[in-house]
Amino acid sequence: MSSDNIFETDSFIKEDSACRNVLVFHKLTDSVSFGSTNYSPKRICQLLESLTDNGYQFVSVSELMNANDSRKIAITFDDGYAHLAAALPPLIDRFKIKPTIFVPTSYVGKNNSWDYSSIFKSEPHLSRQQIEYLSEIGVDFGSHGHRHVGLSSLDNKALDSELSESKNILEEITGKPVESMSFPVGKTNSRVMAAAQKAGYKSSFTMSFPDNSDSNLAMGRVPVYFFDSPDTVMQKLGHTGLYPFHKALCRSATALSVGTVLLNKFLGRP
C-alpha cells in the first residue's frame, strides 16, 4: 500500500491471543447523539462494576505499559469532549479509575467541526480550564493529533508538526509530560509510528482490537459502543462468545470514519 493511503496500517496482530487490555470510549452523556459512540454515565457505572466484580484492576496507560497481568485494564477516551469534565470525577472517586483522554488540541474549547456528525449536532471539546482541572484530579492526557486529520496522508513536515504541536500544547496546559497518543481515525503505518517515537511518544493507540503481539506504538483497544453491555465487553476482552462478530463490527465502524475524512477534504482541510 502507498504511504499516502490514510487507512494503511502495519499489522502487528497475531489472531486471538491474550493481550494488554485497553477500553476506548468517546462520548459519555445521556443526551441523544449521532453515531454509535455515546455511552451513558449509568451504563459505564454498570460496566465498571462488572469489571471490578470480575477481578479487573484499573491502571493508567503508563502503568499498563509495564504490566504483565491480564486482569489490569486501562480506560481511555478519544476526542476529549467537554462533558467529561462532569462525568469523570464521580467515576474516579467511586471506581478509582485512572483514565487517559486523547485530545485534538486545535479544538480545545471549540466545537467538533472536524467530525461529519457535527452537520447534525455539534459537540464542544474540553476547554483549557477543564483540562487543567481534570489533570489535577488524576486524569492523564495524550495527543489525538492537533487538527484531527489522518496522519498517514501528511507529508513528513506536516506530520512532525501535528505530533509535536499537540504534545507541546498539552504539556503547557497540564505541566506534565505527554507520552501517549491515539491516532486520529484509528489508523497508522510505520512512517507515522517512527515519527511518533521521534517526537517523544512512548505509547500510541489504534482502533483495532488488541493482541499480545501489538507494538507499544500501535496498541489496539477494545471499543465500547452505545449498544454494548457488560456481557459483550467481557466477550471482547475474553475472546469468547460473539468475539469474531464484535471484531468484524469494530473494523466496519473504523472504516466508516471515512465520512470525517471526506468532509475535511470537501471543506479544504488538510
Model-derived features: positions:
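Conserved SAM-binding loop
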Residues: I97, V103, V149, D160, ...
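Alpha-helical scaffolding within the catalytic cores
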Residues: N5-S11, A85-A87, Y116-E136
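Surface-exposed cleft-lining segments at the edges of enzyme active sites
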Residues: N111-S122, H148-N156
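Acidic (Asp/Glu)-rich catalytic clusters
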Residues: D16, T52-D53, P90-I97, P124-S143, ...
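Histidine-centered catalytic micro-motifs
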Residues: L23-T29, D140-H148
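A short, conserved beta-to-alpha structural element at the edge of catalytic cores
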Residues: K96-S118
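C-terminal active-site subregion of NodB/CE4 polysaccharide deacetylases
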Residues: M1-I75, A82-A85, S153-S180, G186-P270
